[in-house]
Amino acid sequence: MICFPLDNTEYEAKDMGAYLGTRTRGVFSAEGNFAVTPAENGLAVKVSPGLAWLKRDLYWGVAVLLESEIMLPLEIADGELERIDVIVCRLDKVANKSEVVVKKGEFSGSPVFAQPQRDDNYDEIYLASVMIQAGATGITKADISSLLLNEDYCGLMRDGVTGIPTEAIQEQATALFNGLYEQLQGRADELEQVLEGIV
């Protein structure tokens, strides 16, 4: 059984991983953290420094720190079809390392990208998607869509067993408000009928 931290006790990586195990996948913030921007020239993007969390397994979380900006080249565009590449922060469980890479999309008239890989080999979050226009020789800001706040692909890390279900809470609050409104409207109609009877 792991108990962390205790005095005079030696620990392994999996023990610290258990400490990080309740943190959700995602980035530290969406403000300049793992920001993806066009390179000055050619088919390439830049990724700013950032801090993120990934999962080795259910009870083993890892922190990933990119300390300095990197540049990622993108493969050549097609002359007629488009594709969407994805900028991925991932844990390579087989090689025992983290990395930021380009996941190349398929050429298509209506391109889409696949879901993040989260299995025995990799754990991934998507930082941004990059539209590679037909015949493109460079990347613009309009070609890049940040995925940092999209919880299907990335999201902000939260410390807890589960994130706060804000959408469900909003739906419950709306249903409660609508129910109260209908009740009050019914009472108002009854009061109006009573007053009409008195007058």
Where are the regions a protein language model picked out?
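N-terminal "first-domain core" detector
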Residues: 1-59, 69
